[in-house]
Amino acid sequence: QSYLQSKLLKVICEANYFFYGGNEKGEKLVLSVILSWVYIFLVCMLVGTGVLGFFKKKQFSLIYYLVAGVIAITVYAEFFSLFGKTGACAHGILLAGALVAGFINRNRLRQIWQEYRGVLFSWEGFFYCCFAILIAFFTSRGEFHTDTNIYHAAAIRIYEEYGLVKGIGNLQLHYAYNSSYLAFASIFSFKWLIGQSLHTTTGFLETIMCLYAFHGLRDFVRHKNHVADMMRVGILLYTLVNVIRSMSPATDYATMYFALFIMTAWCTNLFEGESDLTEFSLLSVAAVFTATLKFSSCLLILIAVYPAVCLIRDKKWKEIGGYFFCGCII
């Protein structure tokens, strides 16, 4: 019996290392990173379709659903942290809400799958998968941002174990920065499940933004205007410079990726799209969210002037009220 128990314990330990493999340096196995990304992708996608599902007559590109999901989940984590820790209970409620949103918008999800299925099962999709594995490798091991060792990881742990603590900035000045990204990182840290924070959210954002850039650059030759293409190249260059720090849940990286995405999507809509006012308005709401990631990006909110003027000119008061409400909630 003792022999069987020891063998069973050995199997459990080996399985735990295979799926996680964490150590005191924050290193983890590539497989654990990829599995966490798949889960984060699915949850963000379900929540994002629930949020953008209010626009019943409009279909968005995949990245818009993911970004909407990230924003909505971050706002949820922030509000939940006012009352308790972002642990198993918070995650269970989030998952239940995501499943309900997915069920309600199942037809929209089916349309998205049919649109992108051909890309996934192609050489282009193979390249995307290889690139994701490459980023997963750097997310599994590398360097922490300096501020991560100072307060990022500690602030995430406070979210995980206590929630938002009133006046904590008096103990450590950096806690008072209160970046919303740390709330998002905490709810997908999975410490409540595996006993140690994974810190894979930066790599996730890095991957989806780079794939968004690659997908847009595939039609580079056919584009008459290359302003948006240069913005896509900017995303890739930023990743190239900071790829070895992909494992760090730093607020700087999330802020830059969202800022670059907003500028790229804005230029895409302006120069390659139909200058859709709805997309301009949603990107303005995303700019408000970016300011909550790091206040130094607050000037990005000035892009909201253009859609605001257009909406007021067309007397679309209902839409104005909706976007203003979203900005206040964020």
Regions found by a protein language model. Name each.
Residues 10-16, 21-115:
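Membrane-embedded, hydrophobic transmembrane alpha-helices
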Residues 76-81, 243, 278-295, 299-306:
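Membrane-interface alpha helices of multi-pass inner-membrane proteins
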Residues 89-90, 200-205, 229-235, 241-268:
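Multi-pass, polyprenyl lipid-linked donor-dependent membrane glycosyltransferases
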Residues 96-98, 261-263, 289, 299-312:
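Hydrophobic transmembrane alpha-helices of multi-pass, membrane-embedded glycosylation machinery
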Residues 106-109, 118, 300-328:
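Perimembrane helix-loop-helix junctions
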Residues 134-228, 246-248:
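Active-site lumenal/periplasmic loops and adjacent helix-entry segments of GT-C-fold
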Residues 140-143, 184, 321-330:
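Membrane-lumen/periplasm interface segments of specific transmembrane helices
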Residues 221-222, 262-279:
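Membrane-interface transmembrane helices that cradle and orient dolichyl/undecaprenyl
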